[in-house]
């Protein structure tokens, strides 16, 4: 943003540094997402660029950590086109392991049994967050169903929160992904609509503080 414009409106920080503007619809959706996480399964949060997906993801993670009733795990791999189910298993092992030498087995059968053992040891529901999930390969999306079931077989609960562009929701509606898409809970961050004037006023005031 131009320095001259900021000075004209009396702002001391850019729009990107402002807090998140919460509408009533957003607050309801945020609450519903948290309820869905407690129940487990695949949860998709989608929206266009700049709508607030990453901010919402961070808020969810922060709330869950503060409440300390659900364990938070997240995939940090940046190139989601190359993320596969092994990458997500690694993320879970890194975040859930209680011992430094608790390494993930490379053989699939042993890996899943070890994960089940960790689930029983931690004895809490788990939330696995994946940002930029619209770049995930369809095979990886399908594998998420098996990952959730592996945790359920150990009497655990796993929620996979996939965050991405509207393409993610379209992919999950594809008949080829019906196996996972039919079970997914979809949430969409929408436009402000009638709240736009309030948002502009709030944004300028927020950047003055």
What are these regions (language model features)?
Residues 66-91:
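AAA+/P-loop NTPase substrate/partner-engagement loops
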Residues 1-40:
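A short, basic N-terminal segment
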Residues 185-197:
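Conserved AAA+ ATPase "SRH/arginine-finger" region at the nucleotide-binding site
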Residues 42, 116, 120-162, 167-170, ...:
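Conserved Walker B catalytic segment
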Residues 61, 168-183:
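Short regulatory helix/loop adjacent to the ATP-binding pocket of P-loop NTPases
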Residues 6-13, 83-102, 206:
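Conserved NTP-binding/hydrolysis module of P-loop NTPases
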Residues 39-59:
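Walker A/P-loop nucleotide-binding motif
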Residues 91-96, 166, 175, 198-209:
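Conserved AAA+ ATPase "sensor/coupling" helix adjacent to the nucleotide-binding pocket
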């Amino acid at each position: 943003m131009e320095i001259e414009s900021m000075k004209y409106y009396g702002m001391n920080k850019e729009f990107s540094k402002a807090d998140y503007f919460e509408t009533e619809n957003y607050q309801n959706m945020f609450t519903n997402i948290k309820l869905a996480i407690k129940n487990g399964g695949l949860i998709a949060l989608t929206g266009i660029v700049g709508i607030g997906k990453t901010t919402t993801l961070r808020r969810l993670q922060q709330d869950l950590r503060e409440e300390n009733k659900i364990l938070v795990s997240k995939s940090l791999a940046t190139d989601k086109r190359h993320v596969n189910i092994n990458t997500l298993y690694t993320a879970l092992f890194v975040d859930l392991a209680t011992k430094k030498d608790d390494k993930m087995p490379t053989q699939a059968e042993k890996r899943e049994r070890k994960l089940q053992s960790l689930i029983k040891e931690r004895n809490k529901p788990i939330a696995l967050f994946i940002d930029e999930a619209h770049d995930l390969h369809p095979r990886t999306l399908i594998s998420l169903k098996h990952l959730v079931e592996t945790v359920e077989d150990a009497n655990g609960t796993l929620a996979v929160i996939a965050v991405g562009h509207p393409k993610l929701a379209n992919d999950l509606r594809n008949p080829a992904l019906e196996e996972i898409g039919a079970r997914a809970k979809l949430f969409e961050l929408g436009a402000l609509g009638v709240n736009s004037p309030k948002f502009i006023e709030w944004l300028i005031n927020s950047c003055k503080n």
